[in-house]
Curated annotation (Swiss-Prot):
The lineage of its organism: Eukaryota, Metazoa, Chordata, Craniata, Vertebrata. Disulfide bonds: none annotated. SMART domains: BACK, BTB, Kelch. The gene is Klhl28. Pfam families: BACK, BTB, Kelch_1. The keyword Zinc does not apply. This is Kelch-like protein 28. Keywords: Kelch repeat, Repeat. It comes from Mus musculus (Mouse). Kelch repeats lie at residues 284-331, 332-386, 387-433, 435-479, 480-526, 528-570. PROSITE patterns: BTB. InterPro entries: BACK, BTB-kelch_protein, BTB/POZ_dom, Gal_Oxase/kelch_b-propeller, Kelch-typ_b-propeller, Kelch_1, SKP1/BTB/POZ_sf. Residues 35-102 form the BTB domain. Gene3D superfamilies: 1.25.40.420, Kelch-type beta propeller, Potassium Channel Kv1.1, Chain A.
Amino acid sequence: MDHTAPTYMLANLTHLHSEQLLQGLNLLRQHHELCDIILRVGDVKIHAHKVVLASISPYFKAMFTGNLSEKENSEVEFQCIDEAALQAIVEYAYTGTVFISQDTVESLLPAANLLQIKLVLKECCAFLESQLDPGNCIGISRFAETYGCHDLYLAATKFICQNFESVCQTEEFFELTHADLDEIVSNDCLNVATEETVFYALESWIKYDVQERQKYLAQLLNSVRLPLLSVKFLTRLYEANHLIRDDRTCKHLLNEALKYHFMPEHRLSHQTVLMTRPRCAPKVLCAVGGKSGLFACLDSVEMYFPQNDSWIGLAPLNIPRYEFGICVLDQKVFVIGGIETSVRPGMTVRKHENSVECWNPDTNTWTSLERMNESRSTLGVAVLAGEVFALGGYDGQSYLQSVEKYIPKIRQWQPVAPMTTTRSCFAAAVLDGMLYAIGGYGPAHMNSVERYDPSKDSWEMVAPMADKRIHFGVGVMLGFIFVVGGHNGVSHLSSIERYDPHQNQWTVCRPMKEPRTGVGAAVIDNYLYVVGGHSGSSYLNTVQKYDPISDTWLDSAGMIYCRCNFGLTAL
């Protein structure tokens, strides 16, 4: 006998034992052996063991161990649980499996909720979430709210908001109460191309039962971001809609919206700020690539969270680059063109790119997309009507005035009308359905501004900035275009100015605390974040944010890396 061998062992038979135990208990139940409780629903009797039911349900445990009368009874009657649902739950108690379908879930979930069987309740909610579509999401949302299924309620609400344009054409939408409708259209995350969609949805809901519902018009209209509607639309609304024209409160709301367009001093009031919050407003900043030194081209990417004033690193670019364009479309970050550098023996090679990369926040990965028709660095990029526009720039030999747009549906770049002049190192912005090309170099420093009208496929000059600028930041909020920092050909700038399209006028605002060129700028919650750049003596990672209401600057947490001539966007 080998005395070195262990004299004992611990056999782990947990899985086999559990399986055997469940099978044995289930056989006892099926044969009505050792059963000590009968659950009765109508004329149906379900035999079971108290200890098994109590082990999976706090409800049953309280019933069989507490001071309730059922403790001593051998039969309990249920009047508020569906027979098939109770059968399914008892089956689950003995087998660990439960059948969930569209036919059973509406009775099974309330039963699991009443009996406090969390695992079954969780699976029912997961099943309903997988079944969400425009025709049932409102009903599922109500169902979840009734039974306190918080996560399912949030998922259904998110689905409603993301698919609002389809949801507002369904029967469930027209059967909403005015309070439920008001809650939906007040949501900041409503996914609509324009605020007109929200108004038309409300109008359709009211016309579904106009006699009963027209009394809610003013209350509901107050949830529409009316200042985000065009002057033309607001005017036509007043002229063509007698329900609005005949209601004093509605007329007042329309007049206030028109003031926003014609009286710019009203835009900086607190109430106007609330009424002009964009739907699906950006919540985080994304800083991409750039330079951190004379020959240091970055591929790193980082994200800023205003809630806790902090930055984290993300997946790097496929190609290190700087002086590129950046934008967000369908919650994906597009990085377009720019300069790639590579080091060869005794020299640094600069390549002007026509390549495009796209970052998916769901997977934290970068993928390549279709290349532009032309190589472009120091270009302007913006999204207009669901298409990505790439403007001007420099191809390594010439300054460009050409413009092309990327159409996601056909995955192609197509040319559009060129700008009136060549521009590089400039900024592009979209406001009120128009595309602006601002400042830049071509081949002199410029303060000129031109505007593209997509309906005419043509450009026109508008009022110039006060300062000439290259490599500056731009942001749009409260109906204004803000430009900040840059270089005027002589010195680095700390100045900021805003453009009012209705007055066709630029106004100088309070300057930054320090000058910056090659700076990034983006808007979150009506703050203009100004990030990184070069001060004239050093590369920066510092961040300031501008509050247009108080015309003041505040400090925020700095980036992980110093960056200049990089991409910054909000999403």
